[in-house]
Amino acid sequence: MEWLTGLPRVAGLFVLTALAEIVGCYLPWLVLREGRSLWLLAPTTLALALFAWLLTLHPAAAGRTYAAYGGVYVTVAIAWLWLVDGVRPDRWDALGCALALAGMAVIMLAPRS
């Protein structure tokens, strides 16, 4: 668990990775659901490429990184719901985030040889 000393770095990477993925999915949603300009697909490509690159910077094995990242993704997506979509999360959203983050903590903080 030597990576634990870099926990703030890993947490920051997870948040940046989630933001890149959400932007990469939100922009095409705007094009397809809201009739926005097709030009939004250009930054979509950049956001998804950034997302893929950021995943390579995580210190754990790829499968474990993806699994743990899911907990942070859920939390960032709910924050996006509130800050971008203007929908205030309810207690069930908060509970879901807490459970997802607890699962992420089990995966990332478990003692391994």
UniProtKB/Swiss-Prot annotation:
Record field: transmembrane: 12-32, 37-57, 67-87, 91-111
S-S pairs: none
Example of a GO cellular component annotation carried by this entry: plasma membrane
The keyword Transferase appears for this protein: no
Subcellular location(s) per record: Cell inner membrane
Membrane topology designation: Multi-pass membrane protein
Record's protein name: UPF0060 membrane protein CV_3485
